[in-house]
Amino acid sequence: MTLPTDPAQNLASLIRCRSVTPVEGGALTALEAMLRPLGARVDRPVFSEEGEADVENLYARIGKDGPHLMFAGHTDVVPPGDEDAWTHPPFAAEIAGGEMFGRGAVDMKGGIACFVAALARHLEVSGTPKGSVSFLITGDEEGPSVNGSVKLLEWAAARGERWDAALVGEPTNVETLGDMVKIGRRGSLSGRITLFGRQGHVAYPHLADNPSRGLVALLEALMEPAFDQGTADFPPTNLEITTIDVGNPSVNVIPARATAAFNVRFNDTWSVETLQAEIHNRLDRAAAENRLRPGRTEPVSFELEWRDRPSPVFLTRDDKLVATLAASIEAVTGRKPQLSTTGGTSDARFIKDYCPVIEFGLVGQTMHMVDEKVPLSDLETLTRIYQRFLENWFS
C-alpha cells in the first residue's frame, strides 16, 4: 500500500477540491483517503446551527494510548475572487517556476498536506507512534466558525478524547519558513455603537439633533487615550473603527441616526469582561460631556451592542511543546524561530481550553490573495520539520 509521503501530491489533491466555506467540496474525502492507509479511524460529523449553513468536519485518530498529540486545521478556503485575474486557475494546483498555485496553498491545505506526509514518513521509519496522533479538521474556519472546531472539540471530548498538546498548521511565518511560531493570540472584541438624533434641514440645525456630532466625540473617547502600553508577551491593545454609517445619501439633510462598528485586538492586560467595562465607561463619560453639540444640554443618546463571539487572549506556557517545535525548526532550517503572539485569531482560541496549543505552518505572504502559491521546496522543508517534531515529541 502506497503511503501519502509526498506533500506536493497531497496538496494537489486538496487544492483541486473547491472547498469554499461552508462547502466540503471533496476536500475531507481526499484527506480521509490519505489517512485511512495510515491506520486512522475517521469520523465525519456534521454540525448545524439555526441561521447558519451545515458544516462537515473530520476527526481521525491513529493509536490508542498517550501521549496524545492533536494536529488541527481547516480544509475550507476563502473565495478566489476574480478567477480571470489568476495566472493559474485557483483550483487546478498547477506548478510553475517551482511553485504550486491554488487557493489554500498556504492557508491552510499546505500545512495539512505536509503534516500528513510527515506522519506517513514517521510511521514508515518508526512504526506505530508511542502514543496517539489525531487530526481535528474543520470546514468552518474561514466562515463564522460556529459549526466547526468549537463543536468538533465538544463532540470529541464527549466521546472521551483527551489531548496532551496540539499543533495548528496555520501559515505563521512572515518571510521565511522557520522564522515564527505562534505561542498565543491576542483577544478580539467587536461592537457597534448606535446614536439617535432628530432629522432636519442642514440650514436649521437648531430644529434638529445631528447624531454624527455625538458619534465623533464617542469615537474619540475610544481612540484616546491608549488602552495600555503592551506587556512582556503582547503588543499594545489596539482599537480600529471599521465602519461609520448614517444611511443618508442627501447632503442637505441632517440624519436621524448614526452608527459605527469597531474591533479591538487586546493583550493580557484585559479580559473580555474588563475590556467591555472600560469601553462602556469611556462611552458613558463622553456622552455626559456632550462635546460638539452646541446648545444641547442632554447627554448623547446611544446604544452599545457587542457583536460576534468575543475571543479571549491566551498564551501557551508549555515549555516542552514550545521547545520541541523550536528545536525541530532549528535542526532542519538552522533558524531560531521568534515566539510570537501577533496576528489575527485562529481556531487555537478554542483548542486552548482543552490542551496547550501552538501554531506553525508555511509562509503566509500570499494567503487570501490572487495567485496564492507555495514553493515546492517549502513543502518539503515543512514536512521535514513536522517529521522531526514527531520524532522528538514521541521519543
From Swiss-Prot:
InterPro entries: ArgE/DapE_CS (IPR001261), Bact_exopeptidase_dim_dom (IPR036264), DapE_proteobac (IPR005941), Peptidase_M20 (IPR002933), Peptidase_M20_dimer (IPR011650), Peptidase_M20A (IPR050072)
Residues involved in Zn(2+) 1 binding: 74, 107, 170
Record-listed Zn(2+) 2 binding positions: 107, 142, 368
PROSITE patterns with a match to the protein in the record: ARGE_DAPE_CPG2_1, ARGE_DAPE_CPG2_2
Chemical reaction(s) catalysed: N-succinyl-(2S,6S)-2,6-diaminopimelate + H2O = (2S,6S)-2,6-diaminopimelate + succinate
Disulphide bridges, residue numbers: none
Record note on quaternary structure: Homodimer.
Protein family according to the UniProt entry: Belongs to the peptidase M20A family. DapE subfamily.
HAMAP family: DapE
Name of protein: Succinyl-diaminopimelate desuccinylase
Gene: dapE
